[in-house]
Amino acid sequence: DRDSCVDKSRCAKYGYFQECTDCCKKYGHNGGTCMFFKCKCA
């Protein structure tokens, strides 16, 4: 699920945040970015 990390990772409104990427990688994604305080896995 692309949004599996949204509730687990807090992040800044804009830009990139390491916890988001780490969470996404744990779920098998390549990484993630933060958009509007939410983590989006890529």
From Swiss-Prot:
As recorded in UniProt, coiled-coil segments are none
Instruction: Report the subcellular localization.
Output: Secreted
Transmembrane segment boundaries: none
User: Which Gene3D superfamilies does the record match to this protein?
Assistant: Knottin, scorpion toxin-like (3.30.30.10)
Q: Which GO terms describe its biological process?
A: envenomation resulting in negative regulation of voltage-gated potassium channel activity in another organism
Question: What's an example GO cellular component term for this entry?
Answer: extracellular region
- Disulfide bond positions: 5-23, 11-34, 20-39, 24-41
Keywords (alphabetical) are: Disulfide bond, Ion channel impairing toxin, Neurotoxin, Potassium channel impairing toxin, Secreted, Toxin, Voltage-gated potassium channel impairing toxin
Which tissues is it found in, per the record?
Expressed by the venom gland.
Q: Report the InterPro entries cross-referenced here.
A: Ergtoxin, Scorpion_toxin-like_sf
Chief place where the protein resides: secreted
Job of this protein: Blocks human Kv11.1/KCNH2/ERG1 potassium channels (reversible, IC(50)=3.4 nM). At high toxin concentrations, block of Kv11.1/KCNH2/ERG1 macroscopic current is almost complete. Does not accelerate the kinetics of the closing process and has no effect on the activation and inactivation kinetics of the Kv11.1/KCNH2/ERG1 channels.
In which family does this protein belong, per the annotation?
Belongs to the ergtoxin family. Gamma-KTx 1 subfamily.
How is this protein named in the record? Potassium channel toxin gamma-KTx 1.10
